[in-house]
């Protein structure tokens, strides 16, 4: 009788369904390539911005193109942040819709943990950043509180795919689910806290256009000659409203049907994810990561600024503490429990991995410090440095855990009698 309550305890990081794991496996392959391209683009931007030819980088980044009459005469870097990232957020919107309709987030009991972990992983780094800048007496920097709250799924999954050859699949699924919730919360933060001027006319027009787009796809319309112009008009109106234009991408993604006769979420995601991960996000990274460091002395000077060490502390300390502590508290004080095949060190490695912030963190940095170039550059340096440190710490922890699971796997696949069946699945001769 004493063991009975344990059967009702929900396992944290329990095994997902086979179709869900197949989908995640395909997603891992795409995001791994995207993460590699993201890294290459960021490194290329850093090298160019700190080379004798850095003026060329600035000229390309600041080159203005677009129709002035429509107030779309934007710099190349602004087109990358406002335009190309809308593709990324459209894919995020489709992924969110799918998770809430047929994925792990459709079950409130399963969704509670990643949602709570994501919230904890956003609150703690924000509190650390605010605390650091308050103590330093730089209240003018408080607008950057949201910079360290985001997790870059492409980078995180790329690191996990490289080092985690034998880690339990449930860890990867949990990271993906947490990152999806993280993206949703980051989108809400951008829409609510980084909208400076709101024009209700264009906003209403954008929402009506999105509704027409949604009605079309719900009715089975698939022709890009209709859907693409509607999406562009919705994006332009959202941009004119003062709300960040990428929010239009998310809302358009939410309208894509997941179930039913006209379901096309999987098909659209399959077609657009390579464009997002392979082009849109790397191009954004190229124009967002190019910051003139000024050598070791310049780097050391940047590290002395509260924006820099506030963001780094938020990513390297705040993110892991928030994710790990929330998960532990739920396991300790609710009916949730850690899966018997996992150790808390696995969760620690995952929590450290969540500290890799890049795409959304850089975007929030641009929005928070668009009128403060020095603070903006400090934020860029901090995001890059903090993400690298978090990735390295996660790699150390997860590599050690991967070695443990590799030894377990090797022991479980021993076939001493060469009969094609591992010995662990055969009865012992002395029984």
UniProtKB/Swiss-Prot annotation:
Signal peptide (UniProt feature, chain positions): none
Transmembrane segments: 33-53, 74-94, 112-132, 144-164, 173-193, 197-217, 225-245, 279-299, 311-331, 347-367, 379-399
GO CC annotation terms, alphabetical: plasma membrane
Principal subcellular localization: membrane
Any one Pfam family match given in the protein's UniProt record, by short name: Na_H_antiport_1
Subcellular location: Cell membrane
Gene3D superfamilies: Na+/H+ antiporter like domain (1.20.1530.10)
Catalytic activity entry: Na(+)(in) + 2 H(+)(out) = Na(+)(out) + 2 H(+)(in)
The protein, known as: Na(+)/H(+) antiporter NhaA
Membrane topology note: Multi-pass membrane protein
Keywords: Antiport, Cell membrane, Ion transport, Membrane, Sodium, Sodium transport, Transmembrane, Transmembrane helix, Transport
GO biological process, one term: regulation of pH
GO MF terms held by the record: sodium:proton antiporter activity
Function noted in UniProt: Na(+)/H(+) antiporter that extrudes sodium in exchange for external protons.
Annotated NCBIfam families: NhaA
Family: Belongs to the NhaA Na(+)/H(+) (TC 2.A.33) antiporter family.
Encoding gene, per UniProt annotation: nhaA
């Amino acid at each position: 009788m004493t063991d009975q309550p344990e059967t009702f305890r929900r396992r944290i990081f329990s095994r997902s369904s086979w179709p869900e794991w197949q989908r995640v496996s395909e997603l891992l392959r795409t995001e791994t390539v995207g993460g590699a391209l993201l890294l290459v683009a960021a490194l290329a931007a850093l090298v160019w911005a700190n080379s004798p030819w850095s003026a060329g980088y600035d000229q390309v980044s600041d080159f203005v193109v677009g129709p002035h009459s429509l107030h779309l005469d934007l710099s190349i870097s602004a087109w990358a942040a406002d335009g190309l990232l809308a593709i990324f957020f459209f894919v995020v919107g489709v992924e969110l819709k799918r998770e809430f309709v047929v994925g792990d987030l459709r079950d409130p009991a399963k969704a509670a943990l990643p949602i709570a972990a994501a919230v904890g992983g956003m609150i703690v780094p924000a509190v650390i950043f605010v605390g650091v800048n308050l103590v330093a007496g730089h209240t003018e920097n408080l607008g950057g509180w949201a910079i360290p709250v985001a997790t870059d799924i492409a980078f995180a999954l790329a690191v996990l795919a490289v080092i985690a050859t034998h880690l339990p699949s449930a860890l990867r699924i949990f990271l993906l689910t947490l990152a999806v919730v993280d993206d949703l919360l980051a989108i809400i933060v951008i829409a609510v806290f980084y909208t400076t001027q709101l024009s209700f006319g264009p906003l209403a027009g954008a929402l009506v256009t999105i509704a027409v787009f949604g009605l079309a796809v719900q009715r089975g319309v698939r022709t890009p000659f209709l859907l693409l112009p509607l999406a562009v008009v919705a994006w332009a109106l959202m941009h004119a409203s003062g709300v960040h234009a990428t929010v239009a991408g998310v809302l358009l993604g939410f309208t894509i049907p997941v179930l039913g006769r006209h379901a096309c979420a999987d098909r659209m995601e399959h077609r657009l994810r390579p464009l997002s991960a392979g082009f849109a996000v790397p191009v954004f990274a190229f124009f967002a990561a190019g910051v003139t460091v000024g050598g070791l002395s310049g780097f050391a000077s940047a590290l002395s600024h509260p924006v820099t060490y506030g963001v780094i502390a938020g990513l390297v300390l705040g993110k892991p503490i928030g994710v790990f502590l929330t998960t532990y508290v739920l396991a300790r004080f609710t009916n949730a429990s850690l899966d018997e095949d996992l150790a808390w060190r696995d969760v620690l490695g995952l929590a450290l991995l969540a500290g890799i912030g890049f795409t959304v963190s850089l975007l929030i940095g641009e929005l928070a410090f668009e009128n403060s170039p020095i603070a903006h550059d400090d934020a860029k340096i901090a995001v890059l440095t903090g993400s690298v440190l978090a990735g390295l710490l996660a790699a150390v922890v997860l590599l050690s855990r991967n070695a443990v699971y590799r030894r377990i796997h090797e022991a479980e696949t021993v076939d001493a009698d060469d009969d094609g069946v591992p010995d662990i699945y055969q009865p012992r001769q002395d029984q």
